[in-house]
Amino acid sequence: MRSWILGWLFCSLVAVMQAAPLPRLKVSENKRFLVTEDGKPFFWLGDTAWELFHRLDRRDAEAYLKNRAERRFTVIQAVALAELDGLNDPNANGDRPLEGNDPTKPSEKYFAHVDAIVKKANELGLYIGFLPTWGDKWNKKWGAGPEIFTVANAEQYGEWLGRRYKDAGLIWILGGDRPAETNSHREITRAMARGLRRGDGGAHLITWHPTGGASSSQHFHGEDWLDFNMRQNGHAAEFTGRYDQTRVDYDRTPVKPVLDGEPIYEDHPVSFDAKKFGHSTASDVRRPLYWDLFEGAFGHTYGHHSVWQMWSSAKKPVNNPLMPWTEAILQPGAAQMQHGRALMESRPFLTRVPAPEGIVPEAVETSVPGAGRYRFVATKDSEGTYAMIYAPCGRRFTAKLGVIRGEKVRAWWFDPRTGKATEIGVFKAEGERMFTPPNPGEDLDWVLVLDDVARKYPAPGSRALGR
């Protein structure tokens, strides 16, 4: 009898713990990162699931969310009024989101389905990056549309959503892959932001998802409602002209955190031209992870071309997905994202800054620091206790050991494919030293980690720092 009672109490405790709300998020004091309400660093590791609410039933949604939680994602980006004819094509239960496509008349049955998915995500420790609408509903530059938003109904809809999800674990993402080309577009965005703030009382952060190659900073950087900048560096595979723009937003004033909310997806037609460039691979999605982080981003979003659209053989495909979403969630790139998170969390988090000075340029600079797919980037903490250099390929390079302020440097190789670290050796923290990645000449990436020996940091990627 006693054992039964103890078992019941244990199960009850587990249930209560699972139901505990996720902590609120806020911008860090230095305006570079996100932290929880008690100041703990928050690493945004997002997955792109634009059609989650629209195309999946609850059972499939739960299976998807469990898969992402197991892979240590922290944010799921999903859209209430979805891109793929989300106003007129019913969801998995046969419900449409709005009565008569009127934003002031949301369907209770449709949003009850959204509620259930948000609740399950939160129970699994996942925040929702919640897009109230896709952009074709306010700028039908392309897509199904129709345009349904005005300044007045956008504010009403925003307030309704804010009240409904005030206590949920989420981040609001306005925009939706369309440019804010006119004053009307921008005023609709501002109105929806006002409504959200009024509805949730300021409980949740707000950002804006732009179109390809653009940023929220283009139109809204100085506005109070925009808590951090989101970029869409887009579906090209080259650093130059795309991922180098993360640093541009990092350097803006006033200072705001920056995130790449849509880099190249795994198994996506590269630059939308598969006949010329083929489809992206895991290595193509790993490179932007480290490019963005080392250029100053506070986190990163991953995407898979089949998963964003939740494609199955029963659905019309968009741009030739290679496999059903149920297979795509098992692709290697998704599992490898967590290693980048682990690496960042294994060193002091809130003092990290870009550090291009840690790389010694070669005489031919298109070799190192490089260009195109083969760009070397570096980061460090502002106290000089560690530094990292991302090598996108097996090309030797020279690092400045003096970026570490201690007397001695411990060097490691960190494998972005496995998350394993291997110690190289200990050197004086002065001068320059050449390093050759473990797979010289091969198209395999590595991270060189340099630590101040006196700090006694654990192996890179270790969770020993308690995050």
Locate each region found by the language model.
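Structured core elements
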Residues: Q77, N93-D95, L259-D260, T301, ...
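Extracellular glycoside hydrolase catalytic/binding regions
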Residues: R163, D167-L170, G176-I329
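Active-site mouth of glycoside hydrolases
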Residues: L22, V27-T240
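Boundary at the C-terminal end of the N-terminal hydrophobic targeting segment
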Residues: M17-A19
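Aromatic- and carboxylate-lined catalytic core of secreted/periplasmic carbohydrate-active enzymes
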Residues: K40, P254-P257, E266-H268, T281-G425, ...
